């Protein structure tokens, strides 16, 4: 039985019911339906903190999913898991791969900026101001892209860009 069918969370159950109805109504191939089932189960496992199970489901969804737009969200969620696990290099890779398929994911740009900013802070603590500046410059570029896609969002990033005189 798919994981999402046994989940006790009301929102997850509601999402599952709506998704199942849509899958029946919208013409899709069996592969697309199976890919979505793995994606949905991955989201369910991820929301419960079961990252290993979520990754297994996402990798299986990636194997089956052919639509670049849908693949971008799978890759983005894999990036989220790696971010949560402190695997920032892997996370950046998956966010980048998601953006290659869908350049309109401001949340991926934001998460990449947060990682770069964090690495800049680490470089400062290690006394490497040159490396810190490089990381901060990269964070600024990613935040600018996120803000361009969704003006009015990422207020803290906008404030940081303004305070550090990186906002044009």
From Swiss-Prot:
InterPro entries: PSI_Ycf3_assembly (IPR022818), TPR-like_helical_dom_sf (IPR011990), TPR_rpt (IPR019734), Ycf3/AcsC/BcsC/TPR_MFPF (IPR051685)
Signal peptide: none
A Pfam family per the record: TPR_1
SS bond list: none
Example of a GO biological process term: photosystem I assembly
UniProt entry keywords in alphabetical sequence: Chloroplast, Membrane, Photosynthesis, Plastid, Repeat, Thylakoid, TPR repeat
Compartment(s) where it occurs, according to its Swiss-Prot or TrEMBL record: Plastid, Chloroplast thylakoid membrane
Topology term for the membrane: Peripheral membrane protein
TPR repeats mapped onto the chain: 35-68, 72-105, 120-153
Cellular component terms per the entry's GO annotation: chloroplast thylakoid membrane
Subunit structure and binding partners: Interacts with Y3IP1.
Family as reported in the entry's similarity comment: Belongs to the Ycf3 family.
PANTHER family cross-referenced by the UniProt entry: CELLULOSE SYNTHASE OPERON PROTEIN C, TPR REPEAT-CONTAINING PROTEIN MJ0263
HAMAP family given in the database record: Ycf3
Its job: Essential for the assembly of the photosystem I (PSI) complex. May act as a chaperone-like factor to guide the assembly of the PSI subunits.
UniProt-listed NCBIfam families: PRK02603.1
Protein name per the record: Photosystem I assembly protein Ycf3
Originating species: Arabidopsis thaliana
Gene name per UniProt: ycf3
